[in-house]
Amino acid sequence: MTKADQIFKANIQKIINEGSLSEQARPKYKDGRTAHSKYITGAFAEYDLAKGEFPITTLRPIPIKSAIKELFWIYQDQSNSLDVLEAKYNVHYWNEWEVDQTRTIGQRYGAVVKKHDIISKILKQLAENPWNRRNVISLWDYEAFEETKGLLPCAFQIMFDVRRVGEDLYLDASLTQRSNDILVAHHINAMQYVALQMMIAKHFGWKIGKFFYFVNNLHIYDNQFDQAQELLKRQPVASQPKLVLNVPDGTNFFDIKPDDFELQNYDPVKPQLHFDLAI
């Protein structure tokens, strides 16, 4: 069993056994019912990407291609436009969070990246001093939240550090997430930011190192417990999936394309499970 599957099953079981029930929940299902959840706080995981430990489950198929396209929309296009997301990447699921018929998700995610020119600043300071301890990407912008409506960012902060091991430099990343629907989005979000880590590492010709993942509120919605039990029953495949970025070292961050990523050794358990999303 892969490390990701071990952690996934353990967290599902912990939420079922020890989780707290939500109160005054904000999300709704499509039928208008309040989407309550059972949750734990302070979930943490560590993966050594250099040793082939990738944070993706084999217990159900994870839509990695669309997840990576969403990441490009945020950090390369630096956009909040749903039209850009659909026309360029054929990704539609963010339509559920359109703000006031603006064809945007409000001043969130890519709009905040663009507002602060975050990627250019991160690349510049890593180039000037790889060992600086100030490599923080934060999407938590109170001014932007007051400017427009919109879903507040779930995965909102990632930090980078560089380590030397022998002659090689390794880029580590630490992702902080305020809230995460473990059955649907956990491995999507983790692998998105592993992809971002890989893009920055490739930009400098470094190797990928460790990936640390902290979720403040890790939950299962109250209409997902049958799926949770099904996942606990499933036997994972033995092979370890691996995400590969097929571009030469030193490729500029903004020249990398979604199709440059390849998920190898991925043969997840089927069939896919259905989830009614909470909006």
From Swiss-Prot:
GO function terms (MF aspect): thymidylate synthase activity
One family name in Pfam for this protein: Thymidylat_synt
Database matches in CDD domains: TS_Pyrimidine_HMase
Residues that coordinate or bind dUMP: 133-134, 178-181, 189, 219-221
Keywords: Cytoplasm, Methyltransferase, Nucleotide biosynthesis, Transferase
Disulfide bonds: none
EC number(s) from the headed UniProt entry: 2.1.1.45
Main location: cytoplasm
Residues binding (6R)-5,10-methylene-5,6,7,8-tetrahydrofolate: 181, 278
One Gene Ontology biological process: dTTP biosynthetic process
Subcellular compartments: Cytoplasm
Highest rank taxon of the organism: Bacteria
NCBIfam families: PRK01827.1-1
Primary role: Catalyzes the reductive methylation of 2'-deoxyuridine-5'-monophosphate (dUMP) to 2'-deoxythymidine-5'-monophosphate (dTMP) while utilizing 5,10-methylenetetrahydrofolate (mTHF) as the methyl donor and reductant in the reaction, yielding dihydrofolate (DHF) as a by-product. This enzymatic reaction provides an intracellular de novo source of dTMP, an essential precursor for DNA biosynthesis.
Family: Belongs to the thymidylate synthase family. Bacterial-type ThyA subfamily.
Name of the molecule in the record: Thymidylate synthase
Gene source species: Streptococcus pyogenes serotype M5 (strain Manfredo)
Gene name as annotated: thyA
